[in-house]
Amino acid sequence: MNTLNQQYEEKVRPCIDLIDSLRSLGVEKDLALPAIAVIGDQSSGKSSVLEALSGVALPRGSGIVTRCPLELKMKRKKEGEEWYGKISYQNHEEEIEDPADVEKKIREAQDEMAGVGVGISDDLISLEIGSPGVPDLTLIDLPGIARVAVKGQPENIGDQIKRLIQTFITKQETISLVVVPCNVDIATTEALNMAQRVDPDGERTLGILTKPDLVDKGTEDTVVEIVHNEVIHLKKGYMIVKCRGQKEITERVSLTEAIERETAFFREHVYFHTLYNEGHATVPKLAEKLTLELVHHIEKSLPRLEEQIEEKLTQTRAELERYGNGPPSDAAEKLIFLIDKVTAFTQDAISLTTGEELKCGDRLNVFSMLRREFGQWNAHLSRSGEIFNKKIEKEVEEYEERYRGRELPGFINYKTFEVMVKEQIKQLEEPAVKRLKDVGDAVRKLLVQLAQSSFTGFPNLVKIAKARIEAIKQEKESTAESTLRTQFKMELLVYSQDRTYSSSLSDRKTEEDEEEDKRKVKTFHKERSILYRMDNHATLQELMLHLKSYYKIASQRLADQIPLVIRYQMLQESASQLHREMMQVLQDKENLEFLLKEDSDIGSKRAALQSRLKRLMKARAYLVEF
């Protein structure tokens, strides 16, 4: 750390403290924080590297020794200041007086969280260490990757560990510190493979080579090439360190002495002295690089972090608003609370049916559905008219033969006209009723959605509202169906104002004349249609004009009238009756407790949201003050 200039050194601790403070608040539950995660295969020397950086002994041995994610917060103190330590997990927090107790305390924490034995846990243990001999740095140590389950471990222990590691290194905010022994083929290490899968360009991966003293003779050049980034390229490059081996631990070689031996090893090594001279070797150089990388990473991440906190705050407030504050304890206040709830719901129901904005904030739109349904009804009438026109041309002669009485040729048979019109009108009745039922179902669905939104967390209120909505839907649908069927009975009377009918007939004649002119050009030398070869073709032509003209009037009438009936009963009347019936619910004061009984988990959800809001607001305050 001595190579850092004073100005930069003053920025280091505040940056790291900021993220540590956010993590201690629990903000990591809500969004990803900048971090360095240490990963490696079992026996890669990962624990030894962390020991060398922190100056304290950590759990080590064969098998899985890191069984929970360990947040290692190192704080560099001034020379002469005392060492201190603190361990925190779940609801437990304990100061550590002696550095020699750290390993024991971590094992106790792991047993508490992952069970005694060899299981693992996703829960974080936080270890804070302050000492003049440590860098300003925070790392997250993750369990070593196990290839084969040992006695007492679940068969899928390897998959469990990989899933845990994946949750950390997948985040773009995480730098992966991959620990690899020098005496293995780097390309085959699972830790590096995992890092490459989530970070194929090596943008946020840093390689650490360990155990350089165990390299096979003749392979030293390969190690140098790896550190020089010539084998598997990583943007952040590689470092190489030599930590205490088991022999040195047995001989009680101190960490300070181990670092001195490490420096001598690299400085004097035939092949590795170049790495030492280039600043790629030793634990102190690694500490310096990691601190610089973390601070740079934090500074780079801060703008996005601020945005994420604002987004989460907005989202959390919106969710809390949906859950509300919960019912008050005082009976009189409870009644007021219920009245407000029910009134807001019924007002929103009326607003929904009139196209106004809802107070609950939901974006429910009944009129987009109505436009679609009524548009389809209009399209059905148009298609029916086209089919009717074609049918007229085919069957009008047959009807004339069947229904013509004593009239001389050239006289229009009104009975023929009436029979054909009635037959066509009848075919529209059931499609109109189906349209009513489709709209009724859609309106009920929207009102139920509104009830669930308005009475979130109050299942009994939702149940009562749904029952009322269903009963009203059945009643209004029945009334509307009766009105529709009456409308179709009236349509069988075959009536229109003279002026309206004359206008429609005139328009139709003009259209027919234009079509006839076109047809004459095309069929000048051809045989004319059967209609024009008939002696009474003028009569039949006239009858067709009347039929088409009248159907146009009737269909226009139905295109408006059917939607009006449906809209009036299923929207306006339904909303008004729902308002009246929900107001009646308020008269039953004895059921107050029943109506305001909350979901069993609603209180815990509200508390969780309030807790999230609190920590996010604190997090924002930290960022503002930074």
From Swiss-Prot:
Region entry G3 motif, spans: 141-144
Region (G4 motif), start-end ranges: 210-213
Compartmental location: Cytoplasm
Residue intervals of the Dynamin-type G domain: 30-303
Gene from which this protein is expressed: mx
Listed GO biological process terms: defense response to virus; receptor internalization; synaptic vesicle budding from presynaptic endocytic zone membrane
CDD domains named in the record: DLP_1
Keywords for this protein: Cytoplasm, GTP-binding, Nucleotide-binding
Family: Belongs to the TRAFAC class dynamin-like GTPase superfamily. Dynamin/Fzo/YdjA family.
Spans annotated as G2 motif: 65-67
Pfam families reported in the protein's UniProt record: Dynamin_M, Dynamin_N, GED
Keyword DNA repair in record: no
Name under which the protein is recorded: Interferon-induced GTP-binding protein Mx
